[in-house]
Curated annotation (Swiss-Prot):
Annotated residues for binding of ATP: A188, E189, T190, G191, S192, G193, K194, T195
UniProt name for this protein: ATP-dependent RNA helicase dbp7
Positions of transmembrane segments: none
Superkingdom, natural source: Eukaryota
GO molecular function: ATP binding; ATP hydrolysis activity; RNA binding; RNA helicase activity
EC number: 3.6.4.13
Biological process terms in GO annotation: rRNA processing
Compartments where located: Nucleus, Nucleolus
Short sequence motif named DEAD box, residue ranges: 318-321
Reactions catalysed, as given in the entry: ATP + H2O = ADP + phosphate + H(+)
Region (Disordered): 1-137, 700-769
Source species taxonomy: Eukaryota, Fungi, Dikarya, Ascomycota, Pezizomycotina
Length: 769
């Protein structure tokens, strides 16, 4: 086609022509995106700086009349991360700045689940005081002398120990064990005096060896040359096994009190945590009665030649169910086999030809029956006579899972939401110790050792963070504090103390060194002022702590039997006592039916406590008042606690570690009760509020394990070394900054954890013993 000479002109605006943009290469996609946004921001035309630019038109398609100008924007805070992302000038600096996770502060009294079960109406008529079921008998004919004890021992019980009459289980067991030499299984409720039930016949039998029946002077304990017939060199006659070190210490104290009327009989203890060298020295000197834990006794039977068990004629297994639960089955089998193999005829007249085994337990479960089949032969079952316990009570059918609580124990439960657990506990303790003398001692049971440490720091935080003036004023009192103060196990409970009634707080769990556990427990028992013990189940078995008026189960026990032993720390030997258990709304409310099974009357004495009433009494004072000041006070206390946790990294780590350990412990309930403690129905976000945490549960993570017993003991010794002026020596002659030392420590810790998994039960993971 020929060219016709036409020329076409097209007009385009400047916006149509697209400028070529350089393509960014290299780096990460975040860097490329950041550079692209910066380039786009620079390419935009800048606004005039004189401020005369025309206002931006406001789109108003509906023709709505707008009065006034647009209100000013609020000032951006640090939490407005979305607005900060729009600032392109900071795009290059965002990757170098530390971004804190956004915290959501929830309200204590919003979105809390309601209890499923309605509160049952209570009778307005005052309930009659129940007759104690574990008190000493008041019948004057039932004295210790009538049961077969010698006048010397009976007079010692009356004058020195102030025991006028035996309890029901002591009446049944003493007469039976003194009459026959067969094996026995003693079953009685907690706090009824089982320790004396087997110690009194034991001491009576050994005292009888000192004066045989063919002697003319039966009251004499010496031979013709003036020497005792039975002394510490005569041999070991009896062994008492207990599951925990604290129970062994208590049995030893009771036994030493009995033996003050028979000074020639020597008793001793061998328990874990003590120096084996000192124990071997005591064994070489000679003992007649030995109180021990199974693990340490098995070790001495294997490695200590000075331990002669050829004359052992009495073996007592105290708290048999706990011995099996803690995984001592293999140790007990080995101990029984070695005692049978090493038994020899005794040269001392009056010593029985065969060994008598006594098994004691408050419950009759399958593991106890298994232990009985392993250790007992043709055993007799000793139980308290129901007529002696309570004439009006009807005995229940024997059941493996049945357990009974003392009739005089006043037990209640509170349905508390997860977010309100900590403030409710604080309010209850505030109200309990408001007046001096109302409650002398209380025990708070929690599920794990990390939770014990956290709550101890929470309730004593103001004392430890006091100013220098307060420290100077208390400088004169530090010399009189017990040794446990140096390991931070005893402090003033500032969270619920008041000037008229100061309260001392103690903490106890299985990860503490043995000497610290012993001194802390002794301080709590000897303290004459108001005291509170926060502990795990290490203090729930067999301990007879004086003047314990209240037991609080902040975390429910792992089984009904553990619950029985927990509340058994109060209402002992006929004294009154109270117990309170915290339950969450939902499936945990079904645990009330299990609590009712422990009562002879079907749970009529079990009462329900309203959580709001506890908060009103603790933070407000008047329950019937409609004022909501108590909510503000509880919220202020919770907010102050959360700020304390955020200000200190060590406090935040402690709270997170306690939160994680609590959840792990929550999943270890027995199978029969796991439907009531279902971890899938546990609101983890609300539960974090009870540990002063504002983080989301998915962001709460604490790597590593908590310090064990050995690590805590090493730190304790390291802290004492500079004070004593001694230079700490490193193992192998290495310096402190030697690199292989860290590797050796890590490998040793790994081996220790592997060994603990092989030899310890599942409950030991949470430092229960």
């Amino acid at each position: 086609m020929a060219d016709d000479g036409m020329l076409l002109n097209f007009t385009f605006s400047d916006d149509v022509v697209k400028k070529s943009e350089p393509k960014l290469k290299g780096g990460t996609w975040r860097d490329r995106l950041s550079a692209k946004k910066i380039a786009q921001h620079r390419a935009q035309p800048r606004k005039p700086s004189d401020g005369t630019a025309a206002p931006r038109p406001v789109k108003n398609p509906n023709r709505i009349q707008v009065s006034g100008t647009r209100p000013a924007k609020r000032q951006r805070t640090d939490d407005d991360h979305d607005a900060g992302l729009r600032d392109h000038d900071r795009a290059g600096q965002s990757q170098h700045q530390h971004q804190h996770p956004r915290q959501f502060i929830s309200s204590l009294f919003s979105k809390n689940p309601l209890p499923r079960n309605a509160e049952e109406p209570t009778d307005e008529a005052p309930a009659e005081d129940a007759k104690p079921t574990n008190a000493p008998l008041i019948d004057g004919l039932d004295t210790f002398t009538n049961l077969g004890l010698s006048p010397t021992l009976a007079a010692h019980l009356l004058t020195k120990l102030e025991l006028k009459a035996p309890t029901a289980i002591q009446k049944a067991s003493i007469s039976q064990l003194l009459k026959e030499e067969s094996d026995a299984f003693i079953q009685a409720e907690t706090g009824s005096g089982k320790t004396l039930a087997y110690l009194l016949p034991l001491v009576q039998r050994i005292m009888a060896l000192s004066h045989p029946t063919n002697r003319t002077d039966a009251t004499s304990t010496t031979d013709a040359e003036g020497q005792p017939v039975v002394h510490r060199d005569s041999g070991l006659f009896a062994i008492v096994l207990a599951p925990t070190r604290e129970l062994c210490k208590q049995i030893s104290v009771v036994l030493e009190g009995l033996l003050r009327c028979a000074h020639w009989i020597v008793a001793g203890t061998v328990i874990g945590g003590e120096k084996k060298k000192s124990e071997k020295a005591r064994l070489r000197k000679g003992l007649n009665i030995l109180v021990a834990t199974p693990g340490r006794l098995a070790d001495h039977l294997e490695n200590t030649q000075a331990l002669d068990v050829s004359n052992v004629r009495w073996l007592v297994l105290d708290e048999g169910d706990r011995l099996m639960e803690l995984g001592f089955e293999q140790e007990l089998q080995g101990i029984i086999k070695k005692l049978d193999a090493r038994q020899r005829p005794s040269r001392i007249p009056g010593v029985p030809t065969k060994r008598t085994t006594i098994l004691c337990s408050a419950t009759l479960k399958m593991n106890v029956q298994k232990l009985g089949e392993m250790s007992l032969k043709d055993a007799i079952h000793i139980k308290a006579d129901p007529a002696d316990e309570d004439g009006d009570a009807k005995p229940k059918n024997d059941d493996e899972s049945a357990f009974t609580v003392p009739a005089q124990l006043k037990q209640s439960y509170a349905i508390v939401a997860a977010k309100l657990r900590l403030v409710t506990l604080t309010a209850f303790l505030k109200r309990t110790f408001m007046r001096k003398g109302s409650v002398m001692k209380a025990i708070v049971f929690v599920s794990c050792a990390d939770s014990v440490d956290f709550h101890f720091e929470v309730f004593t935080r103001k004392l430890q963070d006091s100013d220098e003036n307060a420290e100077d004023s208390d400088a004169s009192d530090t010399k009189e504090k017990p040794a446990a103060f140096t390991h931070n196990t005893i402090a003033r409970a500032t969270a619920f103390s008041n000037p008229s009634n100061p309260v001392t707080l103690h903490r106890l769990h299985g990860s503490l060194p043995q000497h610290v556990r012993t001194s802390t427990l002794a301080s709590f028992a000897r303290n004459k002022d108001a005291s509170v013990l926060v502990c795990t189940d290490v203090a729930s078995r067999g301990l007879d702590l004086p003047n314990v008026d209240l037991v609080i189960e902040y975390d429910p026990a792992f089984s009904a039997e553990d619950h029985l032993h927990r509340i058994g720390r109060t209402a002992r030997l006929g004294r009154d006592g109270r117990a309170l258990i915290f339950l969450q709304p939902g499936c945990e409310e079904g645990y009330v039916e299990i609590l009712k099974r422990g009562y002879r009357d079907g749970g009529k004495a079990l009462t329900r406590t309203n959580a709001d009433d506890i908060l009103k009494r603790g933070f407000g004072g008047n329950v019937e008042s409609e004022n909501k000041d108590w909510e503000e006070k509880a919220t202020d206390w919770q907010m102050d606690l959360e700020r304390w946790a955020l200000e200190k990294p060590e406090s935040l780590e402690m709270a997170r570690r306690a939160y994680q350990s609590h959840i792990r412990a929550y999943a270890t309930h027995v199978a029969s009760e796991r439907s009531m403690f279902n971890i899938k129905e546990l609101h983890l976000g609300h539960l974090a509020k009870a540990f002063a945490l504002r983080d989301r549960p998915s962001k709460i993570n604490v790597p590593g394990l908590r310090q064990g017993k050995d690590d805590t003991k090493k730190d304790y010794k390291a802290a004492r070394a500079p004070a004593a002026g001694k230079k700490r020596k490193t193992p192998g002659g290495r310096d402190d900054d030697d690199i292989p030392a860290a590797a050796d420590t890590a490998s040793a810790a790994q081996k220790m954890r592997a060994k603990m998994k092989e030899h310890m039960a599942g409950a030991s993971e949470f430092n229960l013993a």
